[in-house]
Amino acid sequence: LKDKGSTSVMFLSTSSSKTQETNLVYSQVKKELESRKKTGQSVDLTEYCVDSSADFDTEEFVRDMFVSDESLPDVIVCMDEVVTECVCQALVDYNQVGNVKVIGYYYSNVTLNAIDKGIISSAIALDMEEIGRYSINALDEYISFGHSNNYYSVDQHVITKDNTREYRTEDEK
């Protein structure tokens, strides 16, 4: 948050990534930001869901955002891998690295390299091993009982410059 004044935060997702989980992340971040703000600080949260039904819709939306006359937000929170990679490329293309803080999603090579180079601040990644375990548990439950009605909450990890190496394959290290 800025020391004084308003900090604008934009959550950016695509129609294919807009899920209950993205709504949960949005509400948790909003709650956390509201609890951390001090006197004289305010937070302006916006959420955009890009219609990604056609090829390059996400790329076009992100490009339009960077070339429009409207000011860019202080922080962009990307809610899927495609948005993260599009925003990374736009930051470089439009010379905005350092002007906009970006929190990416997932850990592709592009995202990890962008974190290492300081293009984006960090990324959020779901614990894939845990997803696999829970999937097997749900499948076992379905086979045994004919249904599975549990909700499995999966851990999220924050990837920063300090730990990108942990998310690379052996060949990439």
Mark where each language-model region is.
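Hinge/cleft segment of the Venus flytrap/periplasmic-binding protein
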Residues: 36, 127-173
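Cofactor-binding loop segments of dinucleotide-utilizing enzymes, especially the Rossmann-like FAD-
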Residues: 14, 105-107, 161
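Short histidine/acidic/glycine/proline-rich micro-motifs that form metal-
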Residues: 14-20
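Beta-alpha-beta core module
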Residues: 110-120
